[in-house]
A protein has these predicted regions:
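Glycine-rich "substrate-gating" loop/helix at the edge of Rossmann-like oxidoreductase active sites
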Residues: 158-161, 189-198, 217-228
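Conserved beta-loop-beta element that borders a ligand/cofactor-binding pocket
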Residues: 134, 171-194
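Substrate-positioning beta->alpha
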Residues: 117, 168, 201, 218-238, ...
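Mid/C-terminal beta-alpha module of Rossmann-like enzyme folds, strongest
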Residues: 233-301, 319, 324, 334-354
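Conserved Rossmann-fold NAD(P)-dependent oxidoreductase catalytic core, especially the SDR/UDP-sugar
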Residues: 109, 113-162, 184
Length: 354
């Protein structure tokens, strides 16, 4: 059973309940930490669902209630959901490795079963609406045109467990919608921005770049989204998103070369000299993955075959649906990179070079 506590013991929990509590899962993650701050600045009362023992740096100084528990435990999920009027389900186990069977099972249980538990509890507790964070990895890809919400996911392509589970998450949302729950999927691309405490994959690349430890990179490209934009997309989806629908939230497509140039402009550090051919890196990643897989099957790695494949797909998206139905308007990605860098400097993660 989950345990309810608060970072602000002077706040009466019953007053929180009467004001219409918003629940956020994954509030210590990159998206969740930024969404939490946005909701608090809007004057909302927020509860977060947190695994015991997790770092609370992302929550320090913020007036929130915490329910401790695990998405895989329906009872603790029920405790978290009870009394909430709306839910942002941002928590997920993100991974670009295939991993062993135990790893795949954990990704499935956290992402798919965890979402199922949230949605089922929301139905039982009479929650008004749920916004679930989706992933572009669960959206179909056509090299001839940008991806949109109508593009089907093809399960027999070479898929990473993470992308496949996020596809199944969308099915869980459709099932809950059919059962009467108002639920919307807000699909994210690669996120860049401040309050990146873990840090994220892109955040770590920026840190390494600023420290001069990023020796090489590979060409490619991807669709990126600023924390400001992905948070705005979630808030808009909660406000006016149609139940049973998903909306892709993106700022812009950017090549890796362009991203490295932008990192250089923001940090004042030179671009890595070594630009590895994509084909060569793909082979190296495959060989290294097989070697590392035998020794360390579940250890995160920078250049996995899955990550290389994603960059080489040059995925672009069409976010007209979010623009037309939600009123979404993207902001410059350069602002997000600068905000991320300044936040890392403020927290002492990066020491600026003079």
């Amino acid at each position: 059973m989950g345990m309810l506590t608060s970072l602000n013991s002077s706040k009466n929990h019953l007053s929180f309940m009467s004001q219409g509590v918003i629940l956020i899962t994954g509030a210590t993650g990159h998206l969740g930490a930024n969404l939490l701050r946005r909701l608090l600045s809007d004057g909302d009362t927020v509860r977060v669902f947190q695994r015991p023992g997790r770092d609370h740096e992302a929550l320090q100084g913020l007036e929130v209630d915490i329910v401790y528990g695990d998405l895989r435990d329906p009872e603790s999920v029920e405790v978290a959901v009870k009394g909430c009027s709306r839910i942002y389900h941002c928590a997920a186990m993100v991974s670009t490795i295939d991993g062993d069977q135990a790893h795949k099972r954990e990704v499935y249980e956290v992402n798919v079963l965890g979402t199922r538990h949230i949605l089922e509890a929301a139905l039982r507790q009479g929650v008004e609406k749920v916004v679930v964070s989706g992933s572009l990895s669960a959206t179909g890809h056509d090299p001839e045109r940008p991806s949109d919400e109508s593009m089907p996911f093809y399960p027999f392509d070479r898929q990473m467990p993470y992308g496949f589970t996020k596809h199944l998450v969308e099915h869980e949302c459709l099932r809950a919608h059919a059962e009467g729950l108002k639920v919307v999927v807000a699909t994210s691309c690669a996120i860049i921005g401040p309050h990146d405490y873990v840090p994220s994959r892109m955040g770590q690349v920026l840190i390494d770049y600023a420290k001069g430890s990023l020796r090489a990179y590979i060409p490619g490209g991807f669709e990126f989204v600023s924390t400001l934009d992905i948070v705005e997309g979630h808030v808009l989806a909660m406000k006016s998103g149609r139940s049973g629908q998903k909306y892709i939230i993106s700022s812009t497509y950017m090549s890796v070369d362009e991203l490295m140039t932008l990192f250089g402009e923001v940090t004042g550090c030179p671009k890595p000299r070594l630009r590895l051919p994509a084909g060569v890196m793909a082979v190296i990643a495959e060989v290294a993955d097989r070697s590392w897989f035998r020794l360390f099957p579940n250890r995160p790695r920078r250049f996995t075959p899955g990550a290389v494949r994603l960059l080489q797909m040059h995925r672009k998206v069409d976010h007209r649906k979010a623009r037309d139905e939600l009123g979404f308007r993207p902001t410059p990605l350069s602002d997000a990179v600068r905000a991320a860098y300044e936040d890392f400097v403020r927290r002492g993660v990066i020491v600026p070079k003079v």
